Amino acid sequence: MPKQKTHRASAKRFKRTGSGGLKRFRAFTSHRFHGKTKKQRRHLRKAGLVSSGDFKRIKAMVTGL
């Protein structure tokens, strides 16, 4: 049986946290900031954690995490 390949796009987008979770960056941060409030822009700068429902799928795609 061949080894499972890592999904490279996912490997670049997610990092493992110290407690075992997956850190992700937020969407809607590339342009059109004039339509967003200052509070929205500030919260979009912070990284988020992957939800438990998505965790299993992403972990299967990224074998090295």
From Swiss-Prot:
GO terms for biological process: translation. Pfam families: Ribosomal_L35p. One of its GO terms (cellular component) is cytosolic large ribosomal subunit. Residues 1-20 are annotated as: Disordered. Keywords: Ribonucleoprotein, Ribosomal protein. One of its GO terms (molecular function) is structural constituent of ribosome. InterPro entries: Ribosomal_bL35 (IPR001706), Ribosomal_bL35-like (IPR021137), Ribosomal_bL35_CS (IPR018265), Ribosomal_bL35_sf (IPR037229). Residues 1-16 have a biased composition (Basic residues). Belongs to the bacterial ribosomal protein bL35 family. PANTHER family: 54S RIBOSOMAL PROTEIN BL35M (PTHR33343), LARGE RIBOSOMAL SUBUNIT PROTEIN BL35M (PTHR33343:SF1). NCBIfam families: rpmI_bact. HAMAP family: Ribosomal_bL35. This is Large ribosomal subunit protein bL35. The gene is rpmI.
